[in-house]
């Protein structure tokens, strides 16, 4: 089994990702979704956590070999980013969702020098909006952002467009497509549920019709 499929299987096993096509979850945006993800759960499982951080380190070395600093997004990207930075023996910073309203008013915490080559760590890519805002904040501070890495992506077309429009490279450990196939192979979902999950990826508004 490939590392991406192994991680997808782990996410299902520890219930970091839950699938429920027949009783959908409601996202904050109001969208009815057959999937819910809380990758913070991975931190509670040392073996899973170690595999994820090791895979992140290898992914970054392969995709972004010039990296000089790792930055985590607040809050979910911070623990993963800090562990990855330790693996790679690199400096670590983190990026707030908005600047502090006191003190120095920093949005990027840590020491980032102008032109320093950065990789931003996120746990999940949904629409991509929040992590791309973090990238923009880091660039305003002078960082040269090489790209974004994440544990998992829903592979939504709107996110793909946003990354393409921003000119930001995205690399993930595993994907929605891989995860739902693993879910079918392991009996987590039925063939009929798999078809609903595929429809959700194609169109988040009409998948239930």
UniProtKB/Swiss-Prot annotation:
Species, as recorded: Lactococcus lactis subsp. lactis (strain IL1403)
What does this protein need as cofactor? Mg(2+)
Disulfides per UniProt: none
Q: Quaternary state and partners of this protein?
A: Homodimer.
Q: Where does orotate bind?
A: 126
This chain belongs to which protein, by name?
Orotate phosphoribosyltransferase
What does the record give as the function of this protein?
A: Catalyzes the transfer of a ribosyl phosphate group from 5-phosphoribose 1-diphosphate to orotate, leading to the formation of orotidine monophosphate (OMP).
PANTHER family in UniProt: OROTATE PHOSPHORIBOSYLTRANSFERASE, URIDINE 5'-MONOPHOSPHATE SYNTHASE
């Amino acid at each position: 089994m490939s590392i991406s499929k192994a991680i997808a299987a782990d996410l299902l096993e520890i219930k970091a990702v839950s699938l429920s096509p027949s009783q959908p979850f409601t996202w904050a945006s109001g969208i009815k979704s057959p999937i819910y993800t809380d990758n913070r759960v991975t931190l509670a499982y040392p073996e899973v956590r170690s595999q994820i951080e090791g895979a992140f380190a290898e992914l970054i070395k392969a995709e972004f070999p010039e990296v000089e600093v790792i930055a985590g997004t607040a809050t979910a990207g911070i623990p993963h980013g800090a562990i990855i930075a330790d693996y790679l023996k690199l400096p670590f910073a983190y990026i707030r969702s908005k600047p502090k309203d006191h003190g120095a008013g920093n949005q990027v915490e840590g020491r980032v020098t102008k032109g320093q080559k950065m990789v931003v760590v996120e746990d999940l890519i949904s629409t991509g909006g929040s992590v791309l805002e973090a990238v923009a904040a880091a660039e305003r501070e002078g960082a040269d952002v090489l790209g974004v890495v994440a544990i998992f992506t829903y592979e939504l077309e709107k996110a793909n467009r946003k990354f393409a429009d921003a000119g930001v490279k995205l690399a993930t450990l595993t994907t929605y497509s891989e995860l739902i196939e693993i879910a079918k192979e392991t009996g987590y979902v039925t063939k009929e549920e798999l078809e609903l999950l595929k429809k959700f990826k194609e169109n988040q508004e009409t998948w239930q019709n």
